[in-house]
A protein has these predicted regions:
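Short acidic loop-to-helix transition motifs that present clustered carboxylates
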Residues: 65-68, 92-93, 114-117, 176-181
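Active-site C-terminal subdomain of aminotransferase-like
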Residues: 198-291, 297-299
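Active-site phosphate-binding strand-loop segment of PLP-dependent enzymes
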Residues: 117-175, 180
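PLP-dependent aminotransferase-like
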Residues: 77-138
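Conserved N-terminal alpha-helix of the aminotransferase class I/II PLP-enzyme fold
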Residues: 12-77, 90
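Conserved active-site segment immediately N-terminal to the catalytic lysine
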Residues: 186-199
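PLP-dependent enzyme catalytic core of the Aspartate aminotransferase-like
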Residues: 129-130, 134, 268, 333-334, ...
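Conserved PLP-binding catalytic core of the aspartate aminotransferase-like
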Residues: 277, 281, 293-330
């Protein structure tokens, strides 16, 4: 799978067996809030996660997409006069759907196009200025995709954070593909909100996300219920409105995220990150010479997700009796699974946490298939 950062750790598998039943985690809830559970230490874990992401507060959510949707819902209430969200043009489809479901409008920041698809931070500033000129208001939010899902480009958040501070516009970092794989420094990058994915990048069973937010927005996010029944006088003052009481991660998702956290912290240290980048760039250095292959995205790679344009394989598929299915079958014969069936025009892969012997086998498999079909 391309989301290799979501592969469970041995510790997570053990926790999954113990806490896989329904509301298992909530059996230990004494305060009516999942984030207040002390045994297992959910509350301590969330404090540690906030330190790890270098942001003031963290709460679990149903997924990174839900984190983005909630941020936009909160800001829509806080700034009703604003209705435009600025996003990079490599943003995930869920960023757009989050905008749409909140009845907001989108303005895209352009990229440089093929083959690198670079985002220029100055285009964010120009887009903000254009929004002010067109509407007379600031954008409600600026969103940057830290690592995009298609090319694995790493975009530096700091220049965008500086621009957002200059204009006093909230800044949301979508770290679904980076939080848990690369170091995250929300303080340094001046991030107001960060959306992370446990099942994509933090070795948790899905679905689970995280929403990190600065203290400036604490009261907006953690707004307590104030409703009271007219007959029963029922009230639920400890419940958080935006989460319908509690985030829906009551058992396996949250406990596996917690169990994997020590491993996630270790693997995001500089030495481990550098080792993973050596692996992905090792593969690319050995296939870069092949005519009919084009590596898309910025190089050298700073994230292990790769998009390889493969017109040479497409040409083989046109005359092969198995058409586009031939490529998946060739990899399967070599002990490599996970390729999309019928696709020969592009190859997306993620080398994260493969051993060096697996990296070399994968590289050899690509070269072997090329040799078989006289692709040089």
């Amino acid at each position: 799978p391309i989301q290799r950062g979501g592969m469970l750790t041995p510790e997570a598998y053990k926790a999954l067996i113990s806490y896989g039943d329904g509301y298992s985690l909530c059996d230990n809830c004494l305060k009516g809030r999942i984030d207040k559970i002390e045994n297992p230490p959910v509350s301590d874990f969330l404090e540690d996660m906030a330190k790890f992401l270098e942001i003031d507060n963290v709460t679990p959510t149903a997924a990174a997409r839900e984190s983005k949707r909630l941020v936009m819902e909160i800001l829509s209430k806080k700034y009703p006069e604003r209705n435009i969200v600025i996003v990079d043009s490599l943003a995930h489809y869920t960023s757009y759907i989050a905008i749409e479901t909140n009845n907001l409008r989108v303005k895209e920041v352009p990229n440089s196009g093929k083959p690198e698809f670079r985002i220029d931070p100055q285009d964010y500033e120009r887009t903000i200025e254009n929004v002010i000129k067109e509407t007379g208001n600031l954008p409600i939010l600026v969103l940057l995709t830290h690592v995009d899902y298609k090319y694995g480009n790493v975009n530096d958040p700091k220049p965008i954070g500086e621009i957002c501070k200059k204009f006093q516009v909230p800044f949301l970092l979508n770290a679904a593909y980076s939080g848990g794989v690369l170091p995250i420094s929300c303080k340094e990058w001046m991030v107001d909100f960060v959306a992370c994915s446990g099942h994509k990048s933090m070795s948790a069973s899905g679905p689970i996300g995280l929403l990190g937010f600065s203290s400036e927005f604490y009261k907006d996010v953690m707004k307590h219920s104030s409703i009271k029944g007219n007959l029963t006088s029922k009230s639920f003052t400890n419940k958080i409105c935006i989460f319908m009481g509690c985030p829906p991660v009551y058992g396996a998702p949250l406990i596996t995220l917690m169990a994997s956290f020590p491993s996630v912290v270790k693997r995001t240290q500089k030495k481990r990150v550098e080792e993973e980048l050596k692996k992905v760039n090792y593969v690319l250095e050995r296939i870069n010479h092949i005519k009919g292959f084009e590596i898309l995205g910025k190089q050298p790679k700073l994230h292990p997700l790769v998009n390889l344009n493969t017109p040479a394989f497409k040409e083989v598929a046109e005359s092969h009796p198995r058409r586009g299915f031939f490529l998946r079958e060739e990899f399967k014969e070599r002990g490599i699974i996970g390729m999309l069936p019928g696709i020969s025009t592009e190859l997306k892969f993620n080398t994260y946490q493969l051993s060096w012997s697996q990296i070399k086998h994968f590289t050899s498999a690509i070269l072997s298939i090329c040799d078989k079909y006289n692709i040089t």
